[in-house]
Amino acid sequence: MWDPLVNEFPDSVHGLRCMLAIKYLQALEDTYEPSTLGHELVRDLVSVIRARNYVEATRRYHHFHSRIQGSSKTELRQPIQEPCYCPHCPRHKSKTGLGEQAHVQKAHDVQDV
């Protein structure tokens, strides 16, 4: 666990609160299996706190809030039936294009004329 007496403190009280909230959520995340809705919701809440732009944080929070309102407590620990393909999640971006860079085009052999 993060030791506040050993590590460097943030510049503001708000930064300290955010850091402590993220550390708590990371510890809470370990109590859920990686393929459950609860794990995804905790990760979404961490992304809300880490957003630097107010508009982006509000958008993420509304998305999180609608997902948490539509789920029951028993669903949080159940495996997810359908995978999430949302474009903003960094955990889903790593599944596509492993080993290939997106900006590099493949070379084609051209016959001599």
UniProtKB/Swiss-Prot annotation:
Keyword annotations of the record: Host cytoplasm, Host-virus interaction, Inhibition of host innate immune response by virus, Suppressor of RNA silencing, Viral immunoevasion
GO cellular component: host cell perinuclear region of cytoplasm
Taxonomy, superkingdom: Viruses
Keyword Manganese attributed: no
Compartments in which it is found: Host cytoplasm, Host perinuclear region
Gene Ontology biological process terms in this record: negative regulation of gene silencing by regulatory ncRNA; symbiont-mediated suppression of host innate immune response
Disulfides per UniProt: none
Chain positions covered by the region annotation Disordered: 94-113
Annotated TM spans: none
InterPro entries tied to this protein: Gemini_V2, WCCH
Pfam annotation, one family: WCCH
Keyword Heme annotated: no
Family, similarity comment: Belongs to the geminiviridae protein AV2/V2 family.
Subunit structure: Interacts with host SGS3.
Function per UniProt: Through its interaction with host SGS3, acts as a suppressor of RNA-mediated gene silencing, also known as post-transcriptional gene silencing (PTGS), a mechanism of plant viral defense that limits the accumulation of viral RNAs.
Name of the protein in question: Protein AV2
Lineage, broadest ranks: Viruses, Monodnaviria, Shotokuvirae, Cressdnaviricota, Repensiviricetes
